[in-house]
Structure formats: structure tokens, C-alpha cells
């Protein structure tokens, strides 16, 4: 997605450890127009899949997931990372390791909002090692729901996440695919 790549070039910052900081438009300050276009793109890519719900992990996946849900006229469920006093029973859970934060979080989705005949689309801001998507897949397995695929805003193609998901038969659609973050420079995969 050209517009997204331009935003990354203009506002993205490469940090040590192959970290790409995009807090100017995605995961701190949010560019609503860009998120709308991202939602439209995912809606188009997954239009004929019979999807019933959009799933993501809080918090950076929420904006693109909500815009995708808006475009597809579908509810969005975000897996919570922190325990809630109001959501404490009848939960599907999975442990997810965060590459950038170097912590493990237990994510959870209430069984109340998951139906046995659901077909879900997972949306996430980044795909590097695939831990967030793996956590959602674990919850999908627990719930017995179908998975249409994963819509990823930014994929770090030089890390194993996308390849491992594709090997498992998971459809992965990434809007910006990064080949390298070497020398503090973002290089995109050339299609």
C-alpha cells in the first residue's frame, strides 16, 4: 500500500534491535484517514471470505481493526492484555510474548462474544515473529471458530512470523512488507 509506505518513509524511525517506531501515525498518535484507507484495503482483500467478526490484540491493532470492521459492517473484538474486574470469567486465554516490550502477556477474549459458527479475520499492526497472531490462533482453536486469515499493517519480512503462518495454511495479507531495517533505513520488499 503506497500511502502506508510513504508514511513509514516520512515518519518511521528505525531503533536498535530491528524495531520500527511508527508512533506518529499508528501506535501512539493515530492518523484516522490512513486507518480508514487501511480498513478499506483489508475489507477489499477479504471481501468474499464469509467473515463474521474481526479480532485483534489491544492496543495498537484496535484502530486498523475498527476501520476494517466499519468497512465490512462487522463487530470487532480485541483480546485484552490486562485483567478486568468486569471480564473475569468464561474467557478464552493465551500467553503472548511481546518482542518490543520483552514481556509475556496473557490475552483474553470473553466467550460471550464468540459464536461456534464464527469465521474471524485477525488484524494486527505488526507481524515480526508472529506471537500476537499465534495467541489469537490459540484462542480460535479453543473456541472452535474458523480463521479466514490475518491482515497485517506492517510485516517485517526478514523475521519468521509470516512464513511460519503461511506454512500452517494461514492466509496473510500485509499492506507494507519490510525487507530490511539495516543501517537505520527502511527497505521494502519489491513485489
Swiss-Prot record:
Gene3D superfamilies: 3.40.50.2020. Signal peptide: none annotated. InterPro entries: PRibTrfase_dom, PRTase-like, Pur/Pyrimidine_PRTase, Xanthine_PRibTrfase. Transmembrane segments: none annotated. Homodimer. Its EC number is 2.4.2.22. It is found in: Cytoplasm. Keywords: Cytoplasm, Glycosyltransferase, Purine salvage, Transferase. Pathway: Purine metabolism; XMP biosynthesis via salvage pathway; XMP from xanthine: step 1/1. HAMAP family: XPRTase. Belongs to the purine/pyrimidine phosphoribosyltransferase family. Xpt subfamily. It is an enzyme of class 2 (transferase). It comes from Limosilactobacillus reuteri (strain DSM 20016) (Lactobacillus reuteri). It catalyses: XMP + diphosphate = xanthine + 5-phospho-alpha-D-ribose 1-diphosphate. GO terms for cellular component: cytoplasm. GO terms for biological process: purine ribonucleoside salvage; xanthine metabolic process; XMP salvage. GO terms for molecular function: xanthine phosphoribosyltransferase activity. Xanthine binds at residues 20, 27, 156. The keyword Glycosyltransferase applies. The keyword Glycosyltransferase applies. Converts the preformed base xanthine, a product of nucleic acid breakdown, to xanthosine 5'-monophosphate (XMP), so it can be reused for RNA or DNA synthesis. This is Xanthine phosphoribosyltransferase. 5-phospho-alpha-D-ribose 1-diphosphate binds at residues 128-132.
Amino acid at each position: 500500500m503506497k500511502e502506508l509506505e510513504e508514511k513509514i518513509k516520512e515518519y518511521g524511525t528505525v531503533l536498535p534491535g530491528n524495531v520500527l517506531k511508527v508512533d506518529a501515525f499508528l501506535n501512539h498518535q493515530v492518523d484516522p484517514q490512513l486507518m480508514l484507507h487501511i480498513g478499506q484495503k483489508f475489507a477489499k482483500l477479504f471481501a468474499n471470505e464469509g467473515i463474521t467478526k474481526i479480532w485483534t490484540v489491544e492496543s495498537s491493532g484496535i484502530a486498523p481493526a475498527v476501520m476494517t470492521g466499519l468497512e465490512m459492517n462487522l463487530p470487532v473484538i480485541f483480546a485484552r492484555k490486562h485483567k478486568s474486574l468486569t471480564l473475569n470469567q468464561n474467557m478464552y486465554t493465551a500467553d503472548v510474548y511481546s518482542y518490543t516490550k520483552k514481556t509475556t502477556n496473557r490475552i483474553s477474549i470473553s466467550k460471550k462474544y464468540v459464536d461456534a459458527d464464527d469465521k474471524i479475520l485477525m488484524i494486527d499492526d505488526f507481524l515480526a515473529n508472529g506471537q500476537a497472531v499465534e495467541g489469537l490462533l490459540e484462542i480460535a482453536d479453543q473456541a472452535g471458530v474458523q480463521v479466514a486469515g490475518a491482515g497485517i499493517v506492517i510485516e517485517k519480512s526478514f523475521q519468521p512470523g509470516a512464513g511460519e503462518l503461511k506454512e500452517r495454511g494461514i492466509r496473510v495479507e500485509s499492506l507494507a512488507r519490510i525487507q530490511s531495517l539495516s543501517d537505520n533505513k527502511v527497505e521494502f520488499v519489491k513485489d
